[in-house]
C-alpha cells in the first residue's frame, strides 16, 4: 500500500491562508494516494517566540512570556476564526489553543521561579506551536470532508533521554507506528503529526 508523507514547514502554515492551502494540498493528494500522513510545524516565528519566552523567564523576566502567550493566543485565534465555520468546532479549537498556552505559561512560571530552564522543559515548550497547528489543520481537513486526527509525535516516536538532541529508537518507534498510526491509515484517516518532538 502506497503512503505519502507530506511535511509542511513554518511558512507553509504561517497564517490562515497558508493553512488553508496546506489543507487543499493534503486533500488533493488524498485523492491520488491510498494513505496520506501530514507532518506539520509551528507557524513561522512561533518556535523562536516560545524559546524566547522560556529563556527570558529563566533570566528573571516575568513579563515577556506573558506577552508572548497573549500574542500567540491572538494569532492562533485569528486563524481558527477565519478557517473553522462551525461554532462547536471553533470553540473546541479555541479551547485547545488555551490549553496549550496555559501549559506554556505554567512551565514559564516555574522556570521564572527556579531561574533555569531544563532541556526537557525546553523540548516541551518549543513543541507547543506545532501541537496547536496540528489540531487546527486536522479540524480544517474534517471540515472539508476528510477524516483526520491530530497526532502528537510523542505517541509514535520513541527516543533516548538526551533532551534537545534526542536520537530516535527505531525498533520501538516502528512498533508504536504499527500499533497507532497504521490502524488510522487503514481506516482512511489522515493523521496530522507534530513535526519536532518524540518521547
Regions found by a protein language model. Give the residues of each.
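Nucleotide/pyrophosphate-binding catalytic subdomain
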Residues: 1-199
Amino acid at each position: 500500500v502506497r503512503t505519502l508523507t507530506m511535511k509542511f514547514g513554518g511558512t507553509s502554515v504561517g497564517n490562515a491562508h497558508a493553512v488553508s492551502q496546506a489543507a487543499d494540498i493534503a486533500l488533493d493528494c488524498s485523492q491520488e494516494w491510498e494513505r496520506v500522513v501530514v507532518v506539520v510545524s509551528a507557524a513561522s516565528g512561533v518556535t523562536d517566540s516560545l524559546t524566547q519566552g522560556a529563556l527570558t523567564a529563566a533570566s528573571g523576566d516575568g513579563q515577556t512570556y506573558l506577552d508572548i502567550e497573549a500574542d500567540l493566543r491572538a494569532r492562533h485565534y485569528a486563524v481558527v476564526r477565519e478557517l473553522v465555520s462551525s461554532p462547536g468546532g471553533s470553540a473546541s479549537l479555541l479551547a485547545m489553543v488555551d490549553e496549550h498556552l496555559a501549559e506554556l505559561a505554567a512551565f514559564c512560571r516555574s522556570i521564572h521561579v527556579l531561574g533555569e530552564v531544563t532541556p526537557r522543559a525546553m523540548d516541551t515548550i518549543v513543541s507547543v506551536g506545532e501541537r496547536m497547528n496540528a489540531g487546527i489543520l486536522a479540524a480544517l481537513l474534517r471540515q472539508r470532508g476528510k477524516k483526520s486526527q491530530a497526532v502528537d509525535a510523542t505517541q509514535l516516536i520513541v527516543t533516548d533521554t538526551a533532551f534537545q538532541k534526542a536520537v530516535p529508537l527505531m525498533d520501538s518507534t516502528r512498533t508504536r507506528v504499527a500499533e497507532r498510526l497504521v490502524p488510522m491509515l487503514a481506516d482512511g484517516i489522515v493523521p496530522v503529526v507534530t513535526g519536532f518532538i518524540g518521547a
